Each structure stands twice: as C-alpha cells, then as structure tokens.
Amino acid sequence: MSIDLKSRFLQVYDSLKSDLIHDPAFEFDDDSRNWVERMLDYNVPGGKLNRGLSVVDSYKLLKQEELTEDEVFLACALGWCIEWLQAYFLVLDDIMDESHTRRGQPCWFRLPKVGMIAVNDGVVLRNHIPRILKKHFRGKAYYADLLDLFNEVEFQTASGQMIDLITTLFGQKELSKYSLSTHQRIVKFKTAYYSFYLPVACALLMFGENLDDHVQVKDVLVEMGTYFQVQDDYLDCFGSPEVIGKIGTDIEDFKCSWLVVKALELADEQQKKLLNENYGRKDPASVAKVKELYHTLNLQGVFEDYENKSHEKIIKSIETHPSKAVQEVLKSFLGKIFKRQK
C-alpha cells in the first residue's frame, strides 16, 4: 500500500465528509454540523482502512493500467462507503456487546455527551451511504447494482449479527448449541460478505462486470472471510491488546468463538465441565480458567495448523479461476491477512 494512495484515500474522506455536512436535503446549523463532523471523525477513518483501500487495489489489478484521477476518486468513494458501513455496524455492535474500547479509544457511546444518541448516529451513518452513491454514481450504468449490492450485504450482515446475538442470549447459556457449523454460519453472514466480498464486488462493478458471473469469486472470498474471523477469534484471546487496539471479551460475552468450539471438540468430560462452569462469566478468575484450558489443549498449535491448511486450500481455489487478473486480486487480498497480528 503506497503512502500516496493512503493519503489520497484520506483526502477523498475529507471531500465526502464536506458534502455530507453541507447536504442540502437537511438544514444544518453549527451544532448539528459539528456533531456529525465529530461523530464521523471519531468513527469512520480510525481503523486500518483495509476494506476501503481494497476497492482501489482490486480495481487497479483488474484494470492493469494507470488509473485516471476520476477512477481513483470513484474507487476511493466506494471504499469509503464500505468504511461507513463498517462504522455503522461497529457503533451499534459496541452498544449491544457493552464494549469499552474500540481501535484503542473508548467506544463512541461511552463518551459522556454521547450515550444512547449513538443509536441514532448509527442510523445516520447508514443513511450517508446512499447519499454518497447518489452524488457520485447516479449516472453510471452500474448504479442500481451498487445500491442492490450494499442493501444485500447489509441484510446478510445484520442477519449474521442476529444469529450471533440470539445464540448468546443471556440466561440461556448452552454451550451444547455451539458447533463448527454454527460458527461458520455466523461468520459467513456477519463478517465475510461485507469485509471480503463487498470490496471486490464494488471493484468488479466499476470494471463493468456482472456479479452473477462471479459466484466462484464470492465463494473464495467467503472462505477467506471465515479464515479472517477465526484469526480474529484467536487474537481476541491470544493477541496483545496494545497491538489489536481492544481488550478481548469473547470469553466473558459467551461468544460462539472458534476457540470455544475447538475446545469443546478436544476436551474430555472434566474439561467440558470446567468450560460450562466458567465460559460466559464476567469475573476474571473464570476467564483465567478458560484461558488456562485453551493453553492445556494447545489451541495455539491447533490454530497454526488450521491457518496453514486454510491458506493452502484458498490458494488452490484461487488458482482454478480462469482470469489471471482476478487471481491477482484474490491473492493480494489473502496476502494482506495471512499470519496477521492485528
């Protein structure tokens, strides 16, 4: 990722933000304009920006020649729509999970003057996406396809979040509900579509492709998204909070994490009893017992093995694709996440 592209990408953010806080469809005053600007700056550009930048990278690899200034702007704008979608999900997700930190700072709803206004802010973030698309893509042949794509992916993600939440309903802590297939279903819908398929699908639409012709690409990206979430589950427990920017709470939150699913597969009856008694409890002693069991079961080794096998399998799937340019797009995506630490 060149520094040039990242700084160009951030310039496009400033331009989109300026459009939104001067949107003629609403009568802004100083208070509302300042609120939206502060809310955007706090929640939208703070992450690694991988999803957004991937649209530009993918489009470049598909086009295989220098992009015009206009193409760079449009690819960046689509990338930012994904970052806006991500911000909308995270603002609401943090409230539902009662999280404390996100990207190394307090969650938006935890700020003294924000609180539950964050719910409406989430709705505002979601509504910014069609505003951006309308302003910059309305005249394009693929405009309707873009709107469809964002709506479809939002529905899939919200439905994945729903399975995640109802599987972890408070007062119904049943570890027996947790299996690899439940985990994969949550991950496929909650993470893989918006984090992996959406950026490449945006680039393909911009390039003039029909998404119905790229089901294989979708399948590979969903597989990659599953691998990414397993990494996330692993880092939640074994990653360093300073590096990942948040304190993992999957154990306390009774999450259907890959680690607990694997632990249930490998544990003997005594160890399962320990898991049932301690998983999903907020007190540090219970969390420590679960982590200790993860170490005893060598889940670090099990994860390493999974990581290497997944990488091999995904590479094989990619190499069956007829287009070398599409292969490059998929391999560059995989390269960004393989053996990541955050």
Swiss-Prot record:
**Which biological processes are named by the entry's GO terms?**
farnesyl diphosphate biosynthetic process; geranyl diphosphate biosynthetic process
**How does temperature influence activity?**
Optimum temperature is 40 degrees Celsius.
- Which residues hold dimethylallyl diphosphate? R102, K190, T191, Q229, K246, K255
- Give the catalytic activity: isopentenyl diphosphate + (2E)-geranyl diphosphate = (2E,6E)-farnesyl diphosphate + diphosphate; isopentenyl diphosphate + dimethylallyl diphosphate = (2E)-geranyl diphosphate + diphosphate
One of the record's GO molecular function terms: metal ion binding
Recorded hits in Gene3D superfamilies, A to Z, give: Farnesyl Diphosphate Synthase (1.10.600.10)
Q: For Mg(2+) 1, which residues are the binding ones?
A: D93, D97
Q: What InterPro entries is this protein classified in?
A: FPS1-like, Isoprenoid_synthase_dom_sf, Polyprenyl_synt, Polyprenyl_synt_CS
What tissue specificity is annotated for this entry? Answer: Expressed in shoots.
Which cofactor is recorded for it?
Answer: Mg(2+); Mn(2+)
Q: Where is Mg(2+) 2 annotated to bind?
A: D93, D97
Disulfide-bonded cysteines: none
Q: Where is this motif: DDXXD motif?
A: 93-97, 232-236
**PROSITE patterns the record matches:** POLYPRENYL_SYNTHASE_1, POLYPRENYL_SYNTHASE_2
On whether Transferase is a keyword of this UniProt record, the answer is yes
Q: How does activity depend on pH?
A: Optimum pH is 7.0-8.0.
Entry comment, domain topic? The Asp-Asp-Xaa-Xaa-Asp/Glu (DDXXD/E) motif is important for the catalytic activity, presumably through binding to Mg(2+).
Function (record text): Catalyzes the sequential condensation of isopentenyl pyrophosphate (IPP) with the allylic pyrophosphates, dimethylallyl pyrophosphate (DMAPP), and then with the resultant geranylpyrophosphate (GPP) to the ultimate product farnesyl pyrophosphate (FPP). Has a greater affinity for DMAPP versus GPP.
Which protein are we looking at?
A: Farnesyl diphosphate synthase 2
Primary gene name: FDS-2
